[in-house]
């Protein structure tokens, strides 16, 4: 069977080595004669897995000791509400920076739970010569007392990424669902990081939360127990039965990434992949991208065909060539190639070759 390259934005492709290992031990994990899906989450074997997973993640991201690492339910949207409920209380205020669809969704959830009087927002995307560009505000000039400022460094729908570190007088809460471990960051700059697993970590159903200890002292709203960070810390992410298979696969992905040399190594590969694809887009007037170069996403490359009537043919022929899930989000249309950690350079090279051939045929 010829290679299939899956460019889905999420759930995304997993490393082939991880999938093969999971396949090999699906029915007999750790020599127990049963699947990892069937063992107790409180058994010594699974507890050992969780401890190793946390240790590996801490090593990969250089997480300081005053941060807790949580493996939780609910994905990114679950964290939209959890952040508000855990940190705002009845009087606290927060600032949301809006750069695209996912930061807008986080803002909407915060407004729903806390109301407009507690939630402020700033749109940080402007048009520069017809292209989307991020303009970060000077937060130190804002006269307000916020519990936190929330932002999403990478917008998967819009193909926008913020590479500059945010400078804030208030704790920073960041949705890193699509960029976690794709490039190095300084975790100590953040009050809380959350990430749905289904892009760079594992299958859907799991979310990673990295929270600084002092954030847990903020007043909280009444909320469901399973989304309470304090209870999650107290019970080692096992207040209730966790998504064990997703946790297992996340652990395997962490081990795989370590075997490649860690985040610094994969970051170089990710940069190569993005540069290769954007070079193809820029070199050919048949394709266009709507984001300034400084804010083009490395993880989610969005582009349009000069002739939209060819979109269907492009997708059909791409799929026949083993290049799947390239259709853009329904909100923006066009095409989108997601280049998460598991996507090999060969997959991007195959896409570029196809795009050049398609453009030559239809120009």
Curated annotation (Swiss-Prot):
- A Gene Ontology biological process annotation? L-serine biosynthetic process
Reaction(s) catalysed by this chain, per the record, are: O-phospho-L-serine + 2-oxoglutarate = 3-phosphooxypyruvate + L-glutamate; 4-(phosphooxy)-L-threonine + 2-oxoglutarate = (R)-3-hydroxy-2-oxo-4-phosphooxybutanoate + L-glutamate
Keyword Transferase belongs to the record:
yes
- Residue(s) carrying N6-(pyridoxal phosphate)lysine: 199
SUPFAM superfamilies in alphabetical order:
PLP-dependent transferases (SSF53383)
**UniProt GO MF annotations:** O-phospho-L-serine:2-oxoglutarate aminotransferase activity; pyridoxal phosphate binding
Q: What UniProt keywords are attached to this protein's entry? A: Amino-acid biosynthesis, Aminotransferase, Cytoplasm, Pyridoxal phosphate, Pyridoxine biosynthesis, Serine biosynthesis, Transferase
Task: Provide an example Pfam family for this protein.
Answer: Aminotran_5
Q: Which PROSITE patterns match?
A: AA_TRANSFER_CLASS_5
Report the HAMAP family cross-referenced here: SerC_aminotrans_5
* Protein name as it appears in the record: Phosphoserine aminotransferase
């Amino acid at each position: 069977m010829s290679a299939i390259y899956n460019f889905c934005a999420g759930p995304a492709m997993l490393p082939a080595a991880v999938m093969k290992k999971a396949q090999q031990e699906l029915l007999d994990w750790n020599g127990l004669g049963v699947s990892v899906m069937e063992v107790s989450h409180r058994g010594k074997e699974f507890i050992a897995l969780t401890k190793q997973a946390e240790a590996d993640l801490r090593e990969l991201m250089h997480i300081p000791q005053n941060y807790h690492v949580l493996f939780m339910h609910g994905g990114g949207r679950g964290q939209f509400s959890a952040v508000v409920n855990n940190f705002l209380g009845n009087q606290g205020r927060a600032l949301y920076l809006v750069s695209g669809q996912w930061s807008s969704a986080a803002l909407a959830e915060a407004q729903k739970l806390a109301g407009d009087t507690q939630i402020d927002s700033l749109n940080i995307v402007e048009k520069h010569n017809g292209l989307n560009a991020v303009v970060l505000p000077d937060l130190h000039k804002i006269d307000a007392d916020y519990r936190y400022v929330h932002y999403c460094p990478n917008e998967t729908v819009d193909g926008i990424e913020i590479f500059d570190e945010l400078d804030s007088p208030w704790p920073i809460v960041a949705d890193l669902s699509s960029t976690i471990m794709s490039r190095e960051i300084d975790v100590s700059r953040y009050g809380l990081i959350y990430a749905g697993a289904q892009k760079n970590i594992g299958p859907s159903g799991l979310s990673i939360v990295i929270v600084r200890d002092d954030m847990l002292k903020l007043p909280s709203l009444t909320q469901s127990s399973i989304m309470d960070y304090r209870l999650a810390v107290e019970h080692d992410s096992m207040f209730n039965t966790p998504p064990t298979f997703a946790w297992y696969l996340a652990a395997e992905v962490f081990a795989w990434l370590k075997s490649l040399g860690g985040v610094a190594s994969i970051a170089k590969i990710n940069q190569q992949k993005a540069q290769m694809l954007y070079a193809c887009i820029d070199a050919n007037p048949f394709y266009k991208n709507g984001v300034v170069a400084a804010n083009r996403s490395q993880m989610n490359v969005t582009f349009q065909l000069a002739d939209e009537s060819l979109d269907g043919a492009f997708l059909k022929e791409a799929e026949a060539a083993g290049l799947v899930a390239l259709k853009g989000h329904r909100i923006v249309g066009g095409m989108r190639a997601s280049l998460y950690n598991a996507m090999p350079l060969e997959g991007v090279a195959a896409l570029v070759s196809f795009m050049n051939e398609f453009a030559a045929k239809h120009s």
